[in-house]
Amino acid sequence: MRKLFILCLLGLATVAMAQEKKKEEPVMTKEKGGVYIINTTTLCDTKGYKSPTPLKVTIKKDKIESVEALPNMETPKYFRRITEELIPKFAGLKLEECEKVDALTGATMSSNAIKANLKAAQEYYKANK
């Protein structure tokens, strides 16, 4: 019983530390050359199939330079398709062109969550650059 209690306390401490770390991460950072990096972890909680799908979005001069998927709990088999087939389509697009990218068949929920995260990143960028 005592071991179970200690394990529960350790679990709670881990969750509390993770939440504190989330709060410390800046949503947007400005780099040299007018490059902005937006972390959508706290901006958008739209779930894919299993979990939120946060992104790190790099924007320069109102164009997406790159999009990187951050850790999530999506099914690896399906999310691999997202990272290999969908996410690369956004690089080089103007912000207003992102909505035109179609979701992937067979991974629609995750695709839509990625697009929602991109939209949240765009809105934050426009409001705070």
What are these regions (language model features)?
Residues 1-4:
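Positively charged n-region of N-terminal signal peptides that target proteins for export
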Residues 19-112, 122-129:
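Flexible, solvent-exposed loop/hinge segments and secondary-structure transition points
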